[in-house]
């Protein structure tokens, strides 16, 4: 099972997602069985729904990039070590998402789809995926698409 601690910073998020905790509960329930590596494990992560100013500060502090971005991931484990964890209850890390960037990318049409793309991408980083090499990018992208198809029905 995968659970999210949801933190909301700013009022704009509630215009698009009335109850962020319920939103994540429904989405994560659908994908908890998706990862065979996670069978029998309880994963928890924190997601911060924030604004461009806050995410810009985080991006500058942790990635040395002085601009806002749609999503940042802070995995608790390296990609290789994640597979070796034997514990049943695992805190996998943190995700931050930016309202303004997601809203711009959605062209104000399908905000929730763009939001799902962002946090799913972040979640995959938390469970050990990356896109440094081309083959890893395509593998990660394929998994993102499968998850998005599953949760947007």
Please describe what each predicted stretch is.
Residues 1-118, 124-153:
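An acidic/histidine-cluster motif and surrounding catalytic segment
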